[in-house]
């Protein structure tokens, strides 16, 4: 498995997870402020990691 394939796969996985989190946040299924904070923190982390991977791929081109 080469690095570009791995990065693209990770970006796809990250984007899918972000969509699920956004659906949970907007769908009203959050039961507590603690769960809300955890999901928002996860979303921020996924955004950061996804952008770092995209930047690496862009520099590789």
What are these regions (language model features)?
Residues 24-61:
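Short, charge-rich amphipathic interface segments used for partner binding and complex assembly
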Residues 1-28:
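N-terminal acidic leader/helix
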